[in-house]
């Protein structure tokens, strides 16, 4: 086999690249834009890592780089994370939980479920989706309350569609005196003129392929299409959509031990990564990797249990995992991935009891994290800020 080495800093003469048209391509490919050196060279930012053969002719080097043979993400723990603040931003319901966070048109939007309890115990105790808005992350105001008569709404997520709309995805379940009767995910869209969300609409799938509960989890948009997983009983499926409402099957995922909650993340070369919670066996989470058309997958055991998992790509090229930390006492924790794709705890957020389901937004060198916790009483919504070292 060929030996490879990581080159964290690589200086390339700028003038030949500009003359040949390569320079603009490299500016697009590098994680950080190239910057000019005093000697007329182009140097990638300090976080850019290239995987190149130890012995290679320049022509082959350019060809391989342009073909995308470099590290899409750095599978090593993130740079030091410093917790700079945490505050409770909502506690007006007996139970507020399951958060999502997005930066949309310069404002921060935080969504979550509010209800009387984690699961409806009596008829009429169905959950609603509350959305807060903030310009700076300091002061938060109520923006919307989305509800559906006779349906318990939960597990909300906000995303921006390819045509620029703000979309709310949420699960919708029917209960009678605490007994689950069935469920299907719903979507709602923000009207740009009225600044109100539409009534929740059930998603549409082929019922012959998904005859049971249709639970869509965390859509991630990539180009003109959105990808998500549907979990039902002990089966996990990858689906895609072009409008957020109609979903087609991509593949059945060969992931055992009752997989369910799944976060998705795309790499710069169309790689797709899955972070999957599992419920039986060892019940440890797994990490999946694939390339188009996303029908063949490689899986790695993370070595930890997951609860309400989410993913975030950091500016230094590392991947951050947010999940419930299941030790003697539960907490909401932030994890990195090492070279063997095992999770490593980096930071524990102020939390405890019924907690987790974080949302992530990166602004500059600050990571904003929404999550819920019951360490100060009933389950409430919190916002943490973490400084990212570059």
Write out the residue ranges for each language-model feature.
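Positively charged N-terminal leader segments that act as targeting/secretion signals
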Residues: 11-22
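Positively charged n-region of N-terminal signal peptides that target proteins for export
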Residues: 56-60
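Bacterial N-terminal signal peptides
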Residues: 63-74
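Boundary at the C-terminal end of the N-terminal hydrophobic targeting segment
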Residues: 74, 78-80
